[in-house]
């Protein structure tokens, strides 16, 4: 589809004259909790997403050791000078964003391993600091819409430049035992919203964060998987070590394009020998309908979440 055709689409899905302002307000999927409304398509009577409690930020769920709403990081003392590497305590390595608020070095996979820390509420720099991107919330008009095969999806109504922040993947932060419990309760027809983030530190340790927006979450829960995604998930820390799962544009995105990311956290949907053994033993894979040329034909699979249930006291 050409750029002109996509832009035309973005105008065609605007509300009709018959739609009242009250009706349009009711269609805000974000319930007024984001700084921009998130529309729903189609308007009027018809299918609607399954109800859930909206939250723009993480909330503490069962079994989690650290409350994601607590502020544990100290703030910087940049009052008279801008936050720059070398003087700002929040920027120990290099600047996270350029002058256009784009994530630096998108497209260089080696850069993804570097931690991203933003300034927080205790910092002296103020709300206009360039190191406050993810915490500023939505910057582009987005829309939840019904796809042909993938259920509900999320698309942009505006042009999004490569490197810009798009949205978070927010929900309940869970302990591992609770994650396993919820996974084991799922049927083959239930969608799985739980994401497992694993960060490997320099000393060989692995930091795990489990987020589930099934019951409490934000618009990130509507993002579908793609084997050739246009979004990249980056852990961004602001107030504490509990990371925000921030999604940035991996390339320029045109109006009307569906937003997607790789559920495996990579750009290649590969399967390990351990996962293959478990699948061969009867654990089914869900088909992938992304339509990409490199489509792996199935959704990513994390075998560690399907093991024997742990004792709740060990989470």
From Swiss-Prot:
Protein name as catalogued: Histone-lysine N-methyltransferase SETMAR
Organism of origin: Rattus norvegicus
Single GO MF annotation: protein homodimerization activity
Residues that hold Zn(2+) 1 according to the record: 76, 78, 83, 88
Residue runs in coiled coils: none
Lineage: Eukaryota, Metazoa, Chordata, Craniata, Vertebrata
Localization per Swiss-Prot or TrEMBL: Nucleus; Chromosome
Residues at which Zn(2+) 2 binds: 76, 90, 119, 123
Domains as described in the record: In the pre-SET domain, Cys residues bind 3 zinc ions that are arranged in a triangular cluster; some of these Cys residues contribute to the binding of two zinc ions within the cluster.
Start and end residues of each Pre-SET domain: 74-137
Pfam families according to UniProt: Pre-SET, SET
Domain Post-SET: 284-300
InterPro entries listed in its UniProt record: H3K9_Histone-Lys_N-MTase, Post-SET_dom, Pre-SET_dom, SET_dom, SET_dom_sf
Reaction catalyzed: L-lysyl(36)-[histone H3] + 2 S-adenosyl-L-methionine = N(6),N(6)-dimethyl-L-lysyl(36)-[histone H3] + 2 S-adenosyl-L-homocysteine + 2 H(+)
An individual GO BP term: negative regulation of chromosome organization
Function text: Histone methyltransferase that methylates 'Lys-4' and 'Lys-36' of histone H3, 2 specific tags for epigenetic transcriptional activation. Specifically mediates dimethylation of H3 'Lys-36'.
Principal location class: nucleus
Annotated family: Belongs to the class V-like SAM-binding methyltransferase superfamily.
Protein residues bound to Zn(2+) 4: 227, 288, 290, 295
Entry binding sites for S-adenosyl-L-methionine: 150-152, 193, 221, 224-225
Record-listed Zn(2+) 3 binding positions: 83, 119, 125, 129
The entry's keywords: Chromatin regulator, Chromosome, Metal-binding, Methyltransferase, Nucleus, S-adenosyl-L-methionine, Transferase, Zinc
Main EC class the enzyme belongs to: transferase
Domain SET: start-end pairs: 140-264
């Amino acid at each position: 589809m050409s750029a002109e055709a996509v832009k035309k689409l973005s105008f065609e899905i605007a509300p009709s004259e018959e739609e009242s302002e009250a009706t349009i307000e009711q269609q805000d999927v974000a319930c007024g909790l984001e700084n921009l409304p998130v529309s729903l398509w189609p308007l009027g009577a018809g299918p609607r997403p399954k109800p859930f409690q909206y939250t723009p930020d993480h909330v503490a769920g069962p079994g989690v050791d650290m409350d994601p709403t607590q502020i544990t990081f100290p703030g910087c003392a940049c009052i008279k000078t801008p936050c720059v590497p070398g003087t700002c305590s929040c920027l120990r390595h290099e600047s996270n964003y350029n002058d256009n608020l784009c994530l630096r070095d998108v497209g260089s996979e080696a850069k993804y391993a570097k931690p991203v820390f933003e300034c927080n509420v205790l910092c002296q720099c103020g709300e206009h600091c360039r190191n406050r991107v993810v915490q500023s919330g939505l910057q582009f008009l987005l829309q939840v819409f019904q796809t042909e095969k993938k259920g509900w999806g999320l698309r942009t109504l505006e042009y999004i430049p490569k490197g810009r922040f798009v949205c978070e993947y927010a929900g309940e932060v869970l302990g591992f035992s609770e994650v396993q419990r919820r996974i084991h309760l799922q049927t083959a027809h239930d969608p799985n919203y739980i994401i497992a983030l694993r960060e490997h530190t320099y000393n060989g340790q692995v930091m795990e964060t489990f987020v589930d927006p099934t019951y409490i979450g934000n618009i990130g829960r509507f993002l579908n998987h793609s084997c050739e995604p246009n979004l990249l998930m980056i852990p961004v820390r602001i107030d504490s070590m509990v990371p925000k799962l921030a999604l940035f544009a991996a390339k320029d995105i045109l109006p009307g394009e569906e937003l997607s990311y790789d559920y495996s956290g990579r750009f290649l949907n590969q399967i390990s020998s351990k996962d293959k053994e478990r699948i061969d033993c009867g654990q089914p894979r869900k088909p992938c309908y992304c339509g990409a040329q490199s489509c792996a034909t199935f959704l990513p699979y994390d075998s560690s979440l399907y093991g024997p249930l742990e004792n709740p006291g060990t989470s």
